[in-house]
Structure formats: C-alpha cells, structure tokens
Amino acid sequence: MAAAMGLERKAKVAEVALRCAVCALAALAAALVGTGSQTRTFFSLEKKARFTDMKALVLLVAAHGAAAVYSLLQLARCAAAAAWKGGSNGGAAVVAWSVFSCDQAVAYALMAATAAALQSSVVGKRGQPELQWMPVCGLYGAFCRRVGEGLAAAVAAGLAAVLLAAVSAFNLFRLYGGGGGGRKSSAGAVSGNGANTW
C-alpha cells in the first residue's frame, strides 16, 4: 500500500512537471515562430517573410498557443485538486477520462502540427528542384533560423505532451486496477485510500 501511494505521488509530480514543460515549450515555440520576420529589398521592392506566408507555420503557432493555454488551465486544476483534498471521490473517473482524452488530443495535435511545419520548412530550406521551387532560406536566413529555433521548441513540447499523455493514461487506468485494495464505486472505478484524480 505504501508503494502504491509512493508511485501515485511520483505520477502526480511527473504530471505537474510535464504540464509546466509543455506550457513553457509550447508558448516558446509559438512566440518564436509567431514573432519572427525578416524584410528584404528586391529591386526597390520590399518583401517581408512572416509565419503567415506558410500555412503549416500558422497551424504550428495556433496549435502550440492553444496547448500552452490548455496546459496552464490544467496546472490550475492540479493546484485546485491538491488544495482541496477532502470530499467525495465519485467524479474521479469522469475527470480522469476527460483529462486523458484532452491530453491525447493535445499530444496528437502538437505532433501533427510540428510534423507539418518540419516538412514545409525542409522545402523552404532545400527547395524542390523538380518543381522549380527555389530554397528561400538563403534569402531570409534570420527568419529561417528563428523558425528553426521555434521548431526545436515545438519538437520538445510535442515529446513532453506524449509523455504527459502516458502519465494521464496511468492516472486513468490505475482507477480500474485491482492491486490497490480499493473498493469499486458505482461508476466502476476503484476509489481507494481517498485518492483524488487531478
């Protein structure tokens, strides 16, 4: 029983740490890509490179911005659950399923947006000679470096979100495990030792 409580505590600490990491890294990725721009002059015409010029980068900024806000809200939920330790645990399964589903969706969205932005950025960096698309990073080097930094943060945020989804799965499915000596609630979830799901 003490080992189960220790494992549960480690899972909660890991959840908070990963939520902080996702929040910070996703916000950093969105800020780096979203604020990056560079202006070049071609034959007295100014052309400005912005993230809005590439739809995959728009998706990256939107997905990571939303993930940062979601992680911040989940951190507030964790803090509220830690502060409020008493009361009924009847809704633990509903909360755990909701958090698990949302964390899975966020992990998938971050990985998909990052993969799309990486692929588009490779085309921007190397071009596509078969289609006569020239590489643009030679012209907009500072912008491309800024996007590269944002993509590095986006990859890290995506990996942290995947780990967080695994922790959420643990938090959910431990409610249905039989080893904790808990009793079955009316919802079918184990609610042993008064443990709450945050």
Curated annotation (Swiss-Prot):
Residues 34-55, 113-149 are extracellular. It holds the Pfam family CASP_dom. Residues 1-12, 77-91, 171-198 are cytoplasmic. The chain crosses the membrane at residues 13-33, 56-76, 92-112, 150-170. InterPro entries: CASP/CASPL (IPR006459), CASP_dom (IPR006702). It is a multi-pass membrane protein. Keywords: Cell membrane, Membrane, Transmembrane, Transmembrane helix. It is found in: Cell membrane. One of its GO terms (cellular component) is plasma membrane. Homodimer and heterodimers. Belongs to the Casparian strip membrane proteins (CASP) family. This is CASP-like protein 2B1.
